[in-house]
Amino acid sequence: MAKKVTGMIKLQIPAGKANPAPPVGPALGQHGVNIMEFCKQFNARTQALGDSIIPIIITVYQDRSFTFITKTPPVSSLIKKALKLESGSKQPQKDKVGKINNDQIKQIATTKLPDLNCLKVESAMSQVAGTAKSMGIDIA
């Protein structure tokens, strides 16, 4: 018989850098999860991903056990990494902070495709392009 789910927690944590400090500790502590066990498992699973921010969904069960699913980094994070930017524009319609070409958009869309709500790379590319525009990045 399946375990009874008592909670779902969504977090974004840098790869390989989970520790009991906020936001991880308080989020897991209120559900009674062994925080150090989660940190060890997460760090082991994401160690090879560099310093990317990894969204995760943690499922907590009634017996205080847990499972978690790692997702691909957010599109904005992938765009900033591709263009070597600190952040997007504060006024995206006026101030442009960089240019991204279609090859970079396609690479990001291919990376992010399993987590997006679309089936074709072309539709994923339009989502990535929309995110880039909202960050103040021109599409070349």
UniProtKB/Swiss-Prot annotation:
Q: How is it modified after translation?
A: One or more lysine residues are methylated.
Keyword rRNA-binding attributed: yes
Q: Which domain of life is it from?
A: Bacteria
Any coiled-coil regions, as ranges: none
Task: Please state the span of the N-terminal signal peptide per the UniProt entry.
Answer: none
Entry GO terms, CC = cytosolic large ribosomal subunit
Q: Which Pfam families match?
A: Ribosomal_L11, Ribosomal_L11_N
Molecular function GO terms recorded? large ribosomal subunit rRNA binding; structural constituent of ribosome
Which InterPro entries does the record cross-reference, listed alphabetically?
Ribosomal_uL11, Ribosomal_uL11_bac-typ, Ribosomal_uL11_C, Ribosomal_uL11_C_sf, Ribosomal_uL11_N, Ribosomal_uL11_N_sf
Keywords assigned:
Methylation, Ribonucleoprotein, Ribosomal protein, RNA-binding, rRNA-binding
List the GO biological process terms.
Answer: translation
PANTHER family cross-referenced by the UniProt entry: 60S RIBOSOMAL PROTEIN L12, LARGE RIBOSOMAL SUBUNIT PROTEIN UL11M
Q: Which family does it belong to?
A: Belongs to the universal ribosomal protein uL11 family.
HAMAP family according to UniProt: Ribosomal_uL11 (MF_00736)
What do we know about how this protein assembles, alone or with others? Answer: Part of the ribosomal stalk of the 50S ribosomal subunit. Interacts with L10 and the large rRNA to form the base of the stalk. L10 forms an elongated spine to which L12 dimers bind in a sequential fashion forming a multimeric L10(L12)X complex.
What the protein does comes down to: Forms part of the ribosomal stalk which helps the ribosome interact with GTP-bound translation factors.
Record's protein name:
Large ribosomal subunit protein uL11
Source taxonomy: Bacteria, Pseudomonadati, Bdellovibrionota, Bdellovibrionia, Bdellovibrionales
